[in-house]
Amino acid sequence: MKYLLRNIIIILIVVAGVNIFTEKMSEKKKGEANPGTSEDAPTSSFITDATSFEAADEEDEELDADAYSSRDWTSLMAMPTDEQIYSVKGLGRSPYIALYMHFPGVRRAMEYCADFHADHQPKGTYLCPFNWWMDVSSLKEQYTSVYNDYTGTPGGYCGFQRLGDGSRVFIMTVWTTFCEDSDGNVTVFTPKVVYPENKGEANRTNAEGSFVQCILPYDWRAGRDYRVLIQQTNAADTGNVVLTSWVYDMTNHRWDELVSFDTGIRDIYMYSCGGFLENFLTEYTGEVRTMELSNMQARSADTGEWVAADYIQFTVNGSLTKLGYIGSCNFDTDGASLWAITSGVSGLCETPSDEEPYYLEEGVTGDPY
């Protein structure tokens, strides 16, 4: 009887311990799975470590037909043959499609959100959902000149690349801000990557002025859906604006915090958001690239409300670097989404006009978390 009682007590203790552990893990998963609003965003101390993500260098796995977009790409652009693709290898870059998202009534934003999908993402593909400027009005009250030495206006961008070795990465860049006073003295605000630690690299290339950039493995896959969120918060100790990128994998139902930048500046806000689809390796210029964006929303810094984009302004080959572009492209809006397709092979379709806005149907707005 004594031994039976002891065993019962042991079992009860074990069960209680398991229940407590399960509750703790449940709480942790809830925190990890949700970025929260910009007011109560969790700290990165319990978010999946971005450095643990694995890049894939193997060839794309064959996905089920229903994994891909229902869009008939062959009706939007003729598919190039292998011979055509080979014939333009190294001759230039396929068309650079940039886009501006208009959010009615949003003067300044604390968050941007969009869902993206790529059926075709060959090597040398850069799909950028967000490219934004910063409203630095507060600095202009203190200095006679506030600028960035590349675009003129401070800002940043983030997106997803397929590298030449086949690996897939996430990239986020924030430009350095220069402030000059009436005596000609220049104060420099250099952004810093605060998560993950020691991952930022300053001025990695000479092509885009002064900036800090973070590149991390992220295995974004063709035919899958993702949601990307750029969130602005204030550092608890300094009040500096912190810009954080999150990605939601809709296949695995998981939010991941990827990168956080401390801008070193207070009281600035994001505005004028856009994106682009780019081919950055001429060896793969003839390959087909596609991009689809939907659920494009901005959270107003003035009202706190989420607002859906109402039109898109496309631009063809408008890159500041003015590289040599060749080939075909097509783009349009469809309901509350947009799409674009490119190839370095010419004559596959007619290029649409980029002079007029492309309107979107009214999208669903609200908490994207």
Where do the model's predicted regions map?
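N-terminal Sec-pathway targeting helices
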Residues: 1-10
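Local beta-strand/beta-hairpin segments that build beta-sheet-rich folds
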Residues: 85, 252-263, 309
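Carbohydrate-binding surfaces in secreted/extracellular proteins
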Residues: 220-256
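Flexible glycan-contacting loops in extracellular carbohydrate-active proteins
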Residues: 263-287
